UniProtKB/Swiss-Prot annotation:
The lineage of its organism: Bacteria, Pseudomonadati, Pseudomonadota, Gammaproteobacteria, Enterobacterales. Pfam families: Flagellin_C, Flagellin_D3, Flagellin_N, FLIC_barrel. Belongs to the bacterial flagellin family. PANTHER family: FLAGELLIN. GO terms for cellular component: bacterial-type flagellum; extracellular region. It comes from Salmonella abortus-equi. This is Phase 2 flagellin. Transmembrane segments: none annotated.
Length: 501
């Protein structure tokens, strides 16, 4: 080996080995301090990619487990509401069994029916208000999808159903006793279209209202007219030159119950034109029926002319004892009356109708006549109560306000209907119970999978402390030895000086 001064190859070799041992020491210390074998992609590129995929799966499965727990909570909340609905149905069934006993009086049946109605209303309330995190669980048919896996399509569905008195088939449940209406039971009541003759203001009334003017003779009169929802009194007969300006039209009020016409405290003069003279007042001014209502009237046997001229009236009934009973609204077509609904706020009129199949096979919708429509079974609605006229064949069915018991159409086989409702609730509760068990199973499986994936990831990226401690010790020794050897290597060029002595 040549003796040189400029290049100390032994020193360079030693420095290189010292750098390697220092790098190894740094790596060992990094792994020991972080606990990870792979701290960056340079440590193990393939291992880092695999471990990262495991991390994504582990995080996704952990969240899926939380989702499944939320699914259990939803199902549990819904099942709890169904349990309360079931309790109400059990009570309704108990009441239905009680009502079937012939020892009950009509007042007993009315009380039983009142509680049944309240129980059904509570079922509707529970159905409409039960929710989980803003989602109403029984108000409508719905399918909730719960993500229970780390990948697309790994879901469990919760099928929710609308549960209320209507979907249970109990919205018209009635256990009140039904009576047959025989010919001798029919009460021939009278109808009133709600009109009253107007009581026009007298000369004395007019004088008092308009300041006691001078009038010659008995000439002071007032004729009443109507336009756009207002009544007017056309005053005439002022003969004194100073008072003739008081002749003209004034807004007045009309008492619909008595027909009395009166001026206001401060009479208001009007220039209205086109008003129509009236001699009677009605609770509701006549309102013309719309096209659909006219068609229903015609299908009920009303002539086209009478249907076009049909107007709305307020009904009242006088029973056999002379008692006057306020009824609902009706459409007057010709000399007959037909049950109707009237919205006082909007003025909308709708005839109460019955759909039936005519002899020619066509389906028609006829207005319900207060007395029968086209020979079909009809009903009369008075003050919200329905009266069945089917048993009064061959007779003019009028109002029977005294026989409300006869009006109620008793539900046939009520216990069978309630049992069907209970079965419907039980079926949904069973589904919810089963899906809760599914979620529990999914959570257990997710936990096992997360554990196994975590172990697999650990074997790839976690530090083996036994190995890394050994590596650190080796690197430390090499560092110390390398430093010592480097000092010796740096002394080698000194040997060349001996040749110069």
């Amino acid at each position: 080996m040549a003796q040189v001064i400029n290049t100390n190859s032994l020193s360079l070799l030693t420095q290189n080995n010292l750098n390697k041992s220092q790098s190894a020491l740094g790596t060992a210390i990094e792994r020991l301090s972080s606990g990870l074998r792979i701290n960056s992609a340079k440590d193990d590129a393939a291992g880092q990619a695999i471990a990262n995929r495991f991390t994504a799966n582990i995080k996704g499965l952990t969240q899926a487990s939380r989702n499944a727990n939320d699914g259990i909570s939803i199902a549990h909340t819904t099942e709890g509401a169904l349990n309360e609905i079931n309790n109400n149905l059990q009570r309704v069934r108990e009441l239905a069994v009680q009502s079937a006993n012939s020892t009950n009086s009509q007042s007993d049946l009315d009380s039983i029916q009142a509680e049944i109605t309240q129980r059904l209303n509570e079922i509707d309330r529970v159905s409409g208000q039960t929710q989980f995190n803003g989602v109403k669980v029984l108000a409508q048919d719905n399918t909730l999808t719960i993500q229970v896996g780390a990948n697309d399509g790994e879901t469990i569905d919760i099928d929710l159903k609308q549960i209320n008195s209507q979907t249970l088939g109990l919205d018209s449940l009635n256990v009140q006793k039904a009576y047959d209406v025989s010919a001798t039971d029919v009460i021939s009541s009278t109808y009133s279209d709600g009109t009253q003759a107007l009581t026009a203001p007298t000369a004395t009334d007019i004088k008092a209202a308009l300041g006691n003017p001078t009038v010659t003779g008995d000439t002071l009169t007032a004729a009443v007219s109507f336009k756009d929802g207002k009544y007017y009194a056309t005053v005439s007969g002022y003969t004194d030159a100073g008072d003739t300006a008081k002749n003209g039209k004034y807004e007045v009020t009309v008492d619909s119950a008595t027909g009395a016409v009166s001026f206001g405290a401060t009479p208001t003069k009007s220039t209205v034109t086109g008003d129509t003279a009236v001699t009677k007042v009605q609770v509701n001014a006549p309102v013309a029926a719309d096209a659909a209502t006219k068609k229903a009237l015609q299908d009920g046997g009303v002539s086209s002319a009478d249907a076009s001229a049909a107007t709305l009236v307020k009904m009242s009934y006088t029973d056999k004892n002379g008692k006057t009973i306020e009824g609902g609204y009706a459409l007057k077509a010709g000399d007959k009356y037909y049950a109707a609904d009237y919205d006082e706020a909007t003025g909308a009129i709708k005839a109460k109708t019955t759909s039936y199949t005519a002899a020619d096979g066509t389906t028609k919708t006829a207005a319900n006549q207060l007395g029968g429509v086209d020979g079909k079974t009809e009903v009369v609605t008075i003050d919200g109560k329905t009266y069945n006229a089917s048993k009064a064949a061959g007779h003019d069915f009028k109002a029977q306000p005294e026989l409300a018991e006869a009006a109620a159409k008793t539900t046939e086989n009520p216990l069978q209907k309630i049992d069907a409702a209970l079965a419907q609730v039980d079926a949904l509760r069973s589904d919810l119970g089963a899906v809760q068990n599914r979620f529990n199973s999914a959570i257990t499986n997710l936990g096992n999978t997360v554990n196994n994936l975590s172990e697999a990831r650990s074997r790839i990226e976690d530090s083996d402390y036994a190995t890394e401690v050994s590596n650190m010790s080796r690197a430390q020794i090499l560092q110390q030895a390398g430093t010592s050897v480097l000092a010796q290597a740096n002394q080698v060029p000194q040997n060349v000086l001996s040749l110069l002595r």
